């Protein structure tokens, strides 16, 4: 039986969450599911620091009994930006403002913005070395159990794009551009200008040699494009090199990223393997939705990477043993792509299949195995829930036939 003090604490918590949910702008459909996803994302935000967890767990396996077990209890620049953007799209600004304050604090301690790490501890400090806890058996015998994440030391040049998208959308929502946000914007473009042409480990953090990843180059273009959008909206004078840089990166992607033999944008320049992240060539606005190269990329990814209600990141050998499930966020990207190219009924059909995967708690893991019909990976996963919110909102304007 709850004591009076416990009852008071519960009542305060209920009032807090009820008032917060009441402040959100929700789609007209699947409202309870969107609320559940929003609460999940909000709970991953660390209010005292502004950091945002990618997931609250470590080493839940991407394949039962396998080695693909990672620690997600940290704040990625990419994931954090995308998470608070999803909450911002629902009308909640505090998480976005807190995250940008968190990032500004890190930049104050960083020599130059292009030297930002892909991820940090939730308090903004650098991670310790990734370690293996050999004395732990792991979930269902899935070893190793890891603490820390070696991706901290990788080169991931796409991270500046999501940050700049957040700055664009938050400043638009606020109707003003605080000086520190303009400073952040300029820092993101500065970082891209210095390093966009380098190979990197990419969004999927491959533990092998860097490549010229298509998604990374697209996000470098996004950085400059959104920065120019911010400058135009608030009558700021951008450095003259920004427009030239945007065109140079776009030319690079369109010249080198599309593989004529495959008929699609692929994972990296000169390669034939597909990658669901290549959908951002169109989702970002770099290519028009009706461009045949984007349409054929959507078709190829649906054909080769989709299995039932889920979409795999890729099918190529990434250097790690074992298999993994499809990624929920990749599935939501394909739904977005269907909307872009006008395949509204297909978008709704796939969305409903994702919705059917929500358990009784309304939570989503990182991945789904369509053969074993099992959720895999760390849980709950910010990526999965932010993707769900995003497509639910987009579908609100596109009713099925």
Label each region the model flagged:
Residues 1-401:
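Acidic, mature catalytic/reactive cores of soluble proteins
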């Amino acid at each position: 039986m709850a004591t009076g003090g416990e009852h008071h604490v519960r009542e305060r918590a209920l009032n807090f969450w009820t008032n917060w949910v009441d402040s959100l702008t929700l789609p007209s459909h699947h409202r309870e599911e969107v609320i559940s996803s929003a609460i999940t994302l909000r709970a991953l935000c660390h209010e005292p620091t502004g950091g945002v967890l990618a997931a609250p767990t470590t080493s839940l396996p991407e394949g039962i009994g396998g080695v693909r077990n990672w620690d997600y209890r940290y704040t990625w620049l990419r994931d954090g930006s995308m998470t608070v953007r999803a909450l911002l799209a629902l009308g909640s600004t505090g998480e976005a403002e807190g995250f940008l304050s968190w990032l500004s604090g890190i930049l104050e301690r960083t020599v130059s913005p292009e030297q930002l790490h892909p991820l940090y501890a939730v308090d903004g400090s650098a991670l310790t070395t990734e370690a293996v806890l050999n004395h732990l058996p792991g979930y269902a015998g899935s070893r190793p159990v890891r603490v820390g994440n070696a991706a901290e030391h990788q080169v991931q040049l796409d991270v500046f794009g999501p940050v700049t998208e957040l700055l664009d959308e938050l400043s638009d929502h606020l109707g003003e551009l605080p000086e520190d946000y303009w400073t952040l914007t300029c820092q993101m473009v500065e970082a891209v200008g210095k390093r966009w042409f380098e190979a990197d480990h990419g969004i999927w953090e491959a533990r092998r040699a860097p490549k010229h990843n298509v998604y990374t180059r697209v996000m470098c273009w996004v950085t400059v494009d959104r920065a120019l959008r911010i400058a135009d909206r608030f009558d700021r004078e951008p450095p003259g090199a920004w427009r030239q840089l945007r065109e140079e990166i776009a030319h690079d992607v369109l010249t080198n990223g599309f593989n004529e033999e495959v008929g699609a944008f692929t994972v990296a320049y000169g390669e034939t393997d597909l990658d669901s992240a290549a959908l951002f060539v169109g989702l970002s606005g770099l290519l028009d939705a009706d461009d045949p190269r984007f349409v054929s990329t959507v078709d190829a990814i649906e054909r080769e990477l989709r299995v039932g209600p889920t979409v795999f990141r890729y099918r190529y050998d990434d250097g790690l043993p074992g298999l993994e499930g499809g990624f929920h966020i990749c599935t939501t990207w394909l739904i977005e792509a269907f909307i872009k190219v006008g395949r509204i009924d297909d978008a709704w059909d796939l969305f409903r299949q994702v919705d059917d995967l929500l358990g009784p708690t309304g939570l989503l893991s990182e991945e789904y195995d369509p053969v074993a019909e099992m959720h895999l990976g760390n849980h709950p996963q910010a990526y999965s829930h932010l993707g769900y919110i995003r497509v639910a909102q987009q579908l609100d304007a596109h009713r099925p036939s």
